[in-house]
Amino acid sequence: MGSPDIPITYRIDARDRPLSSIRVRPAAGNPQRGWLTADGWTIPVALGRGGIKANKREGDGGTPRGTFRPRQLWWRADRHSRPRTFLPARPIRREDAWCEDPNDRHYNQPVRLAPGQAGDRLTREDHLYDFIVEIDHNAAPRIAGRGSAVFLHLARSNFSPTAGCVSMTEAAMLRLLRRMGRETRIVIG
């Protein structure tokens, strides 16, 4: 005798799926500060010293306006365990850096630097890059001078402006990472 088919149902909570979108908008009266809204909660963020810019250029301090996708998480494994996320995750190594030279063929890409070699190293002492979400700003195609190393990362305690990134507290970053996947849209502007 066979056993009857018994349907099994699983409750899928919305928190078990990546967010469809995250919205970043400037704060009224202060273009270097903003608000990030996701799944019904809103957190303060720091923006670039140039505010949100529709036509981002290298070195202008602007946070690019547009819709982006997260590519991957980079994190300091020497300081933190791997956070829960739907994103691909990569531990940051001592030699990891980001090319910000528009004349270099590796512009706006991760690179490995030799000890003493200049570049935007991802191993910072100040903890701002303990968690980095790489986004697809100026990624395909990469256009020299249109901006590089635009990330979501940790904020300074006073929420001072960034060079063009969106920064937040560690608690907010960890909460956001739990719901962020490669298909999540990051809408800035």
Which residues does each PLM region occupy?
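Cell wall/extracellular polymer interaction/catalysis modules
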Residues: G2-T162, M173-R185, G189
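Short cysteine clusters
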Residues: C165
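Conserved "landmark" site that anchors the functional core of diverse proteins
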Residues: T169
